[in-house]
Amino acid sequence: MSAIRYELIKTDKQTGARLGKIHTPHGTFDTPMFMPVGTLATVKTMSPEELKAMGAGIILSNTYHLWLRPGEELIREAGGLHKFMNWDQPILTDSGGFQVFSLSKMRDIKEEGVHFRNHLNGDKLFLSPEKAIQIQNALGSDIMMSFDECPPYPASHEYMKKSVERTSRWAERGLKAHVRPEDQGLFGIVQGGAYEDLRAQSAKDLVSLDFPGYSIGGLSVGEPKDVMNRVLEHTTPLLPANKPRYLMGVGSPDSLIDGVIRGVDMFDCVLPTRIARNGTCMTSSGRLVIKNAKFTHDFRPIDENCDCYTCKNYSRAYIRHLIRCEETFGIRLTTYHNLHFLLNLMKQVRGAIMEDRLADFREEFFEQYGFNRPDAKNF
């Protein structure tokens, strides 16, 4: 019996987008869903109660960072990640692969795994497919990721082909190392860059291993948005319709909607929390940089169409003052707003699928947000 189960509720007649639920050992969440990122077992400045109140059905934590600090054995001793951070709903952990390839300047990729330097202190470390699974088994997340190679964009077809083949072999090794399949669902990660033939090969390899869910990796790494959309259009039909599909590292409003239209169920990204710390806010009419001087005497909320805690209680002028003074409360307010904005957007997307009007919703949202303008400002 798999630890997780995908339930398809409805398909949008306009686009083919999926409305569903994912059942896990720690509860069920609606899809499509955006997952806030809690890198070190916390979503920066947010409490679990606040995240639940705004509709976060699942959050993500980073295996690499938790392995380094505080260590997976301490978290196992605490009773697992859920008890350690007092979060009783689903948790997804990544494999650590992305961090190994993005944070470490010194790395050596071998068949057995990756030798690299700790980005904090320079110590030599080694991460293999088996080790990545062992760490996640200790963390006790509901959904785990296979260890994959994350090639840069762009990369040659020759390099990408070898990388895809290695990732497929690593996925099989990780599956064999997984000792808690009844408690934790392990996803395979489809790679292949912008090459459709390699995406097809990667998907075929992973589907043959019968994972309970599939991730699409190697996108949102610098490629143009039309390339990402083309890759998704080619890749999602190759994945089983009765299992969840997760697009990794995507969190801008337009990419979330376009990903859903192309059959994706789950998304994560640090974008809403990272830009919030610099005072950049997502609003129903586009990007708003709260530090700008024009908001000095602006006593309206960040977004007059938003009913989040921040917008119901505080003005642009006040939040601008806090952010400019580097007050933590200002970061809390912008973080709360951005997460609420994306989670509410996904709620609206689910409603549009239920009403078979997702294409219409996209058109309306893009027009209001300003994505259709020649000078459109994205994130």
Curated annotation (Swiss-Prot):
Protein residues bound to substrate: 94-98, 148, 191, 218
Cofactor, how bound (note): Binds 1 zinc ion per subunit.
EC number: 2.4.2.29
SUPFAM superfamilies with a match to the protein in the record: tRNA-guanine transglycosylase
SUBUNIT field: Homodimer. Within each dimer, one monomer is responsible for RNA recognition and catalysis, while the other monomer binds to the replacement base PreQ1.
Annotated family: Belongs to the queuine tRNA-ribosyltransferase family.
Protein's name according to its UniProt entry: Queuine tRNA-ribosyltransferase
The species this protein was found in: Listeria monocytogenes serotype 4b (strain CLIP80459)
Lineage: Bacteria, Bacillati, Bacillota, Bacilli, Bacillales
Encoding gene per record: tgt
